[in-house]
């Protein structure tokens, strides 16, 4: 999830204090109302399949396998998308252009027990399968309680 900082304090570095305020206020409300996205990073789901298997699904319509790079280095998963040709459609004059292919980069810190098993791109969804193998020495262990049979009975007097 990406956050952008928001400040209501005027920037006095401009030549005129109010020179760009109305445009900035308009952009702020467009972002807050959802007219413009806060972030250009792809949306994703993370699902636990069972005790050891997980799946990360990214929504990246329009990207091809050759435009994606997935790597793991020092337990950090990096997924990058770089569009080779962002203007795939020739147009004399755009009346509205809402489909934009921005380059993106997502990073996830992985525990040392988590391994990426495979990645698959189909119908605009990139699915990564993970496996989390916990070594036996790190699994919780049940400790039984022994009660000796020769307990003394307390006599009432």
Curated annotation (Swiss-Prot):
Chain ranges of the sHSP domain: 35-148
Family matches, as SUPFAM superfamilies: HSP20-like chaperones (SSF49764)
KW Oxidoreductase (keyword) present: no
Keyword Cytoplasm on entry: no
Key words, A-Z: Stress response
Entry-linked Gene3D superfamilies: 2.60.40.790
Database matches in InterPro entries: A-crystallin/Hsp20_dom, ACD_IbpA/B, HSP20-like_chaperone
Family: Belongs to the small heat shock protein (HSP20) family.
The protein's name in its UniProt record: Small heat shock protein ibp
Organism: Buchnera aphidicola subsp. Acyrthosiphon pisum (strain APS) (Acyrthosiphon pisum symbiotic bacterium)
